[in-house]
Amino acid sequence: MIDRRFAAWCCMVLAGTSAGAAESWTQFRGPTGDGRTQARLPLEWSESRNVRWKTPLPGKAWASPVEADGRIWLANATEDGRRLSLVCVAAATGRVDRDITLFEPATPAFCYPYNSYASPTPVVVGGRVFVHFGSAGTACVSAESGAILWSRQDLPCNHHRGPGSSPIPFEDLLIVNFDGFDVQYVVALDQATGRTVWKTDRSIDYGTADGDLKKAYCTPVVFEHAGRRQLVSPAAVGTVAYDPRTGRELWKVHHGGYNTAARPLYAHGLVVINMEGGDRLLAVRPDGEGDVTKTHVAWKYGKATPTRPSQAIVGDQLYMVNDKGVFTCLDVATGRARWQERREGRHSAALLEARGRLYVCDEDGTTLVVAANPERFELLAENRLEAGCMASPAVVGDDLVIRTKTHLYRIGGPATP
């Protein structure tokens, strides 16, 4: 029997799915976590066209924007990691309303220059903003007053190259992956108090003592399949599914690889998972128990798969771009490639899909708008901004919100069909 909390959570997700342009973008990849929206986004823009406002963002942070109730929230950090903060920008004007210092580490852990000290994306739910900086700290802030409601700095992890996994909400919990050089676990915190509700260590045989090969930067996903709700949480070497209420392990699959960052997707009764190395990309039937490596893998695909950019599923197709700019369309059911197209540019941002159009931001300032066309690669527009994107785009109304390495933009124009 579905409990009331889960029923309420399902209603929230369904409301976000059907709300169209009015939906709030409350977590990494939006309210449903898959980078899809019914908003009528602009097709073309530049520094001098269709930019409603442009706000400078000092510091170095790759966290994606989130939005609720007319406020855009961004995790931020100084380049040296000595100040970790939460920035609030008015969605209507681009004005910075708050810049809240959350943590000031005296001796920040090492962060690889390609990463940042503020790469995990915040979550907004129930009038609270949850901000996560890996082991440097996790905090809850009142969206209305900006007051810090609680904070934690006692969740250990040597990220070795900086944090990357974003927190996700589930009912009254906040769930976070910690897959580090030294320890690997998943933890659920009470949203109201920050206390630990459950913590489950990874049960993966990594086959090595090298902590660098145990790292992962993935954001998990929660869904219900055949009446069973599950938290699918990729790690290095394997992916584990847990009961999101208790942390009990349900199933796991060994696929090799490490440094996974792209968020998994659930569609057509399959979970699509990818990682760097190993099997690279695979689809798993999520109805098993225990080790399902030999029994529940539907297909594998290993050519030009991404490490960082999360994919999008539109209809029966999976669309993706890899880190080096190779676009691919696969059939979700079979894993068969329908087409592949090589373009220029390096990519970290997740794909955003709106009404059959894929918005693909690269690290040099170009955003390609590509049709979700299963028959061929179809470029609809190519748009340039002054600086590139490590963060993934967000949606406010029928506008795009893009965080580049230097600025935050709200991009809008005539509604597209």
Where are these regions (language model features)?
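N-terminal secretory signal peptides that target proteins for export/translocation
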Residues: 1-4
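Bacterial N-terminal signal peptides
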Residues: 8-17
